[in-house]
Each structure stands twice: as structure tokens, then as C-alpha cells.
């Protein structure tokens, strides 16, 4: 059985934890392992932070959109912004690359996403924003949403 959730919120840094906890609560019905849940929460944090800091460049008027689809033991996340987009996507996906070197922990977001998720697709258009599609196959889900 398929179950879906959609969420949107202002591009404020304090909403990053809200997004992480909300997505985790929704995914909990699949009974993921603690490691899987932690990885998904981390990926949500990274993608939302990228949207806020890089996509909207701190402009709180922007909106971050999250869609979560649960099917059997599969979690599909889509995190989207309508910000400035990514100028050079290949370069941005390189470990330690950042356009904001003054920020702590910069340059690891895409690397973390690629290590924790089974599939990562990034679509970005300058001036139109970025959409990140992420898929995770849970190892031993007792899918409660059936």
C-alpha cells in the first residue's frame, strides 16, 4: 500500500529540525532500523539546509517543499526549492566543494546524501530552483502501512 505526505514551510533555519522530525515520524510506520532512520533524518537536514542557505541564500520568504512516499519497504523523498538553482551541478556534487567556505561543515551535503541513500537525483535550473529525489530501500521493514 502506498502512503504519501506533503509538507511546505518557510526557508528559516529553525524549520530544519521541524522537517527532520516530521519526516522521521511519518517514516516510523515502516519500522526502520535506528541506523536507517538516523540516515534519513540526516539527509533531510542536509537537503533542507542546502535549500535555505544556498537556494534561497537566507531569504526567509522562500518556501521549502518536501514530499515523502512510502511503498512497502521503500522511502522516496523529494525536497525542492524555488531558489537560485545550482550554477555547476557536477562541481557542487564534489566532496568539500562549497560556495560558502565561511560556514561550518560546508561542502559535504551531497556526499552525505549519496552515502546514506540508495538513489540520488538532483535537478537544478538557475533562477528556477533545485529538486532532489532520494530513495532508500529499508532492510527489514515491517511495513505497518499495509
Curated annotation (Swiss-Prot):
Keywords recorded for this protein, A-Z: ATP-binding, Kinase, Nucleotide-binding, Serine/threonine-protein kinase, Sporulation, Transferase
Q: A single Gene Ontology molecular function, please?
A: protein serine/threonine kinase activity
Q: Which SMART domains match?
A: HATPase_c
Q: Which InterPro entries match?
A: Anti-sigma-factor_SerPK (IPR050267), Anti-sigma_F (IPR010194), HATPase_C_sf (IPR036890)
For this chain's UniProt record, which GO biological process terms are given?
A: asexual sporulation; negative regulation of sporulation resulting in formation of a cellular spore; sporulation resulting in formation of a cellular spore
- Could you list the residue ranges that cross the membrane? none
Kinase as a keyword? Answer: yes
The protein's Enzyme Commission number: 2.7.11.1
* SUPFAM superfamilies membership: ATPase domain of HSP90 chaperone/DNA topoisomerase II/histidine kinase
Q: Which reaction does it catalyse?
A: L-seryl-[protein] + ATP = O-phospho-L-seryl-[protein] + ADP + H(+); L-threonyl-[protein] + ATP = O-phospho-L-threonyl-[protein] + ADP + H(+)
Known function = Binds to sigma F and blocks its ability to form an RNA polymerase holoenzyme (E-sigma F). Phosphorylates SpoIIAA on a serine residue. This phosphorylation may enable SpoIIAA to act as an anti-anti-sigma factor that counteracts SpoIIAB and thus releases sigma F from inhibition.
Q: Which NCBIfam families does the UniProt entry name for this protein?
A: spIIAB
Q: Which family does it belong to?
A: Belongs to the anti-sigma-factor family.
Q: What's the name of the protein?
A: Anti-sigma F factor
Upper classification of the source organism reads: Bacteria, Bacillati, Bacillota, Bacilli, Bacillales
- Gene name for this UniProt entry: spoIIAB
Amino acid at each position: 500500500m502506498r502512503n504519501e505526505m506533503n509538507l511546505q514551510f518557510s526557508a528559516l533555519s529553525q524549520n530544519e529540525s521541524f522537517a527532520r522530525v516530521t519526516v522521521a515520524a511519518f517514516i516510523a510506520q515502516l519500522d526502520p532500523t535506528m541506523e536507517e532512520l538516523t540516515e534519513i533524518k540526516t539527509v533531510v537536514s542536509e537537503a533542507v539546509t542546502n535549500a535555505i542557505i544556498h537556494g534561497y541564500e537566507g531569504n526567509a520568504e522562500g518556501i521549502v517543499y518536501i514530499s515523502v512516499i512510502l511503498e512497502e519497504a521503500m522511502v522516496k523523498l523529494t525536497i525542492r526549492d524555488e531558489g537560485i538553482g545550482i550554477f555547476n551541478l557536477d562541481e557542487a556534487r564534489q566532496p568539500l566543494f562549497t560556495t560558502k567556505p565561511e560556514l561550518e561543515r560546508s561542502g559535504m551535503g551531497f556526499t552525505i546524501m549519496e552515502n546514506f541513500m540508495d538513489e540520488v537525483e538532483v535537478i537544478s535550473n538557475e533562477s528556477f530552483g533545485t529538486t532532489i529525489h532520494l530513495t532508500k530501500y529499508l532492510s527489514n521493514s515491517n511495513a505497518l502501512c499495509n
